[in-house]
Regions:
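Amphipathic alpha-helical core segments of compact helical bundles
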Residues: 82, 86, 90, 241, ...
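Zinc-dependent metallohydrolase catalytic domains
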Residues: 107-237, 244-326
Length: 326
């Protein structure tokens, strides 16, 4: 449908589709109609009459999430607008808060932390040369996205009308769906980001072999080009190291330098890596969040590796930047 030219798609969770199909086949027609109605009302509740909006929030906001009351109207308006026009609003944010000199400083710091990871790999005593070579190849093949995308989305085809909040919401939803469907059968849009420049976060994308740092996280207190380097390496440097390390954690380590699931470890090295991971799991299992509740180390392993390795290589990068000085 929708003009798709490809008859092949990658389904990450086949069981979800099978389960959904089974549930739909068993459900009475009226139940399916009711489900679609409820989903539509919840999706557009914010721009429907107040009674519907309040009912939707009472369930999704208060009952399910524990939020006692809605945000102020203007904040909700900002959230709605930035969701519909993310790139256009992001361009304004970048112009105001991320000047070229800040991007240049961030580019340099990311490069330094990536290089520190390479030196760390070289120093590993438990990893054999062939595995080190593959790990270094993976590191060298990273794409680093810093601040904002090289290409912005075009919203000229989106029809926005004053005084028509519901219509704008529905047209925006349709516009987004058609944009996503338009990717079918086409080349991979490597320039595309999966997080807006206004987001205070960062991410590692295993399939694309990339690390991404939006402009909003490259701000104080994480990053300030005028601050002492130690502050920046301890702040954003640890975040950069964290995302780099995700590509080599218990999940990221399953992907090769091309972003493909592949077994690139020697059996001996993989065994040593898994043993180290098990030790970290056991360490975190001992941490008590509050009386009687312990961290489940197996569930947090990837983040724990990211935190531990990330801070370590950020420190290494800072020490290296001193050029031997103390």
């Amino acid at each position: 449908g929708v003009g798709a030219k490809s008859d092949q798609v990658i389904v990450y969770q086949p069981s979800a589709f099978a389960g959904t199909a089974a549930a739909i086949s068993k459900a009475p027609l009226q139940v399916l109609k009711d489900q679609l109605l409820v989903r539509s009302l919840s999706a557009y509740g914010a721009v429907l009459p107040k009674e519907i909006d309040d009912t939707v929030f009472a369930f999704y906001g208060t009952t399910l999430s524990g939020t006692p009351q809605q945000e102020e109207r203007w904040k909700r308006g900002v959230t709605f607008t930035t969701g519909a026009l993310a790139d256009d609003i992001s361009k304004i944010y970048v112009q105001r808060h991320f000047p070229p000199e800040t991007k240049a400083a961030a580019d340099e710091l990311v490069k330094n932390v990536v290089e520190a990871m390479g030196r760390r790999i070289d120093q590993l005593t438990w990893m054999q040369p062939q595995t080190k070579a593959r790990a270094k190849a993976k590191l060298a093949n990273f794409t680093t996205k810093i601040g904002y995308p090289d290409q912005w989305r075009d919203y000229s085809g989106l029809d926005i009308r004053a005084g028509d909040a519901l219509g704008n919401a529905m047209r925006s939803s349709e516009f987004e769906h058609l944009y996503q469907y338009g990717k079918l059968g086409g080349p991979i849009r490597k320039w595309e980001w999966f997080m807006t420049p206004m987001t205070i976060n960062a991410y590692a994308n295993f399939n694309m072999s990339e690390i991404v740092f939006p402009a909003a996280i490259l701000q104080p207190p994480f990053f300030d080009p005028n601050a002492d380097p130690a502050i920046n390496y301890g702040g954003i440097g640890a975040v950069i190291g964290h995302e780099i390390s995700h590509h080599f954690d218990d999940q990221g380590a399953k992907y090769d330098e091309n972003g493909r699931l592949a077994d690139w470890w020697t059996p001996e090295d993989l065994k040593a890596f898994e043993a180290a991971g098990k030790a970290l799991v056991e360490q975190y299992n001992q941490y008590e969040i509050f009386p009687g509740a312990h961290v489940q180390g197996a569930l947090t392993l990837g983040e724990n590796i990211g935190d531990l390795a990330g801070l370590t290589i950020a420190y290494d990068a800072w020490k290296h930047s001193l050029g031997g000085q103390e």
